């Protein structure tokens, strides 16, 4: 088995198109990092200067409570940007500005300038409770999330400091999934059609080792390539983000990035998405190989995968009703592995426990991976 696995893995890695595609996708990530530093924004500041000001300002505010004093510190910087067009000071407290905009659902200067501590917390609680009620499909889920809102706001929020690196990585996970699926559609679509094209099917079917061992070796090789490239993508993202934005702020509350009562830090949220991404890479790898086995055509397999990918990119949301449609839609890796896809208000009750979507879906992916492997093996035997 080990010998067959190594042979199939070597054969897969010898494809030039695999290295070309993977290299281009990794280069895209590196170019994203370079663009973040070099581009000039509407404020007239270069990206690297904005990051520096953001980091310095975040460090100065780290550990402070989000209260009237912080709002009073923020207001002069915002007024200077609005009335004088100078955004340098605002960059130091941009996290607070963006947080206010999300809570108030506006970018209007008059409303942001008028906000005080009481208004901010009232609007925040109202928004969190309304979103929880709207996103919950059952009374049990609504009750669960309302209790989470109460826990989150039981004491004033504390700004943990600069956390742009982790926030950027969490926001980019949908793009990362797009790159991964694109790679898999090229790298694995020819795994089984190659045997038919090269007229080696008969050799496989009559192998003294049996078809089970041969196809298991192929599946493991494809899985290694898919998950391995996923790890390489994550390592590149982590490296580029660390160089450009830095990796401080792991423990900052995720509420400053995603208005949802998760009770988790932005670093924890990002690691959850990393795990979901790898589980999605595994199930998509197996799905690509099953499709190539069924169609016996690499172009058809690639077309199906890319078609689904483009569909989920063009259609950003589906109605919550019927519920089954919404659940299946967000089960697709290109929809689930993102802040908005993974962190939703759906709950699954198991043995008295309330499990969230980001706890359940990666497990479902791993189960689907096993089922797809069995399905591919059954197709091969047939």
List each language-model region with its residue ranges.
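Membrane-helix interface segments
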Residues: 17, 210-211, 297-302
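Residue-level recognition of transmembrane alpha-helices
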Residues: 22-25, 218, 305
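Juxtamembrane non-transmembrane "cap" segments at the membrane-aqueous interface
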Residues: 244-252, 317-340
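Aromatic- and glycine-rich beta-strand/loop motifs that create alpha-glucan
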Residues: 1-21, 25
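Transmembrane helix boundary and interhelical loop/hinge segments in multi-pass membrane proteins
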Residues: 188-203, 207, 211
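Secretory targeting signals
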Residues: 28-81, 116, 120-195, 216-294, ...
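Transmembrane helix segments
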Residues: 35-36, 295-331
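Junction motif at the cytosolic side of a transmembrane helix
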Residues: 8-11, 291-294, 361-382
């Amino acid at each position: 088995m080990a010998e067959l696995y190594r042979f199939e893995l070597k054969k897969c890695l010898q494809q030039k198109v695999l290295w070309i595609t993977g290299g281009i996708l990794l280069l895209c990530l590196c170019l994203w990092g370079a663009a973040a530093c070099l581009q000039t924004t509407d404020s007239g500041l270069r990206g690297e200067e904005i990051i520096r000001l953001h980091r310095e300002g975040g460090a100065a505010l780290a550990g402070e409570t989000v209260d009237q004093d912080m709002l009073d510190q923020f207001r002069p910087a915002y007024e200077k940007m609005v009335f004088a067009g100078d955004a340098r000071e605002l960059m130091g407290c941009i996290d607070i500005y963006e947080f206010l905009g999300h809570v108030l659902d506006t970018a209007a200067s008059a409303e942001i300038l008028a906000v005080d501590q009481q208004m901010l917390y009232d609007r925040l609680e109202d928004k969190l409770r309304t979103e929880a009620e709207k996103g919950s499909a059952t009374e049990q889920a609504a009750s669960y999330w309302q209790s989470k809102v109460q826990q989150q706001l039981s004491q004033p929020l504390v700004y943990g400091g600069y956390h742009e690196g982790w926030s950027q990585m969490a926001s980019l996970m949908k793009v990362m999934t797009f790159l991964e699926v694109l790679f898999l559609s090229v790298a694995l679509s020819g795994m089984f059609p190659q045997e038919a094209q090269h007229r080696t099917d008969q050799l496989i079917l009559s192998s003294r080792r049996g078809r089970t061992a041969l196809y298991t070796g192929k599946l493991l090789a494809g899985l290694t390539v898919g998950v391995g490239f996923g790890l390489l993508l994550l390592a590149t993202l982590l490296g580029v983000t660390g160089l450009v934005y830095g990796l401080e702020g792991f423990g900052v509350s995720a509420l400053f990035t995603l208005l949802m009562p998760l009770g988790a830090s932005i670093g924890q949220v990002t690691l959850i998405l990393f795990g979901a991404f790898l589980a999605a890479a595994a199930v998509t790898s197996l799905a690509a190989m099953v499709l190539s086995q069924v169609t016996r055509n690499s172009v058809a397999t690639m077309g199906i995968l890319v078609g689904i990918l483009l569909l989920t990119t063009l259609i950003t949301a589906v109605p919550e009703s019927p519920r089954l449609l919404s659940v299946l839609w967000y089960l697709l890796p290109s929809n689930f592995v993102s802040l908005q896809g993974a962190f939703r208000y759906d709950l699954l009750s198991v043995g008295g426990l309330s499990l969230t979507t980001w706890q359940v879906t990666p497990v479902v992916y791993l189960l689907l991976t096993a089922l797809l492997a069995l399905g591919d093996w059954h197709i091969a035997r047939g």
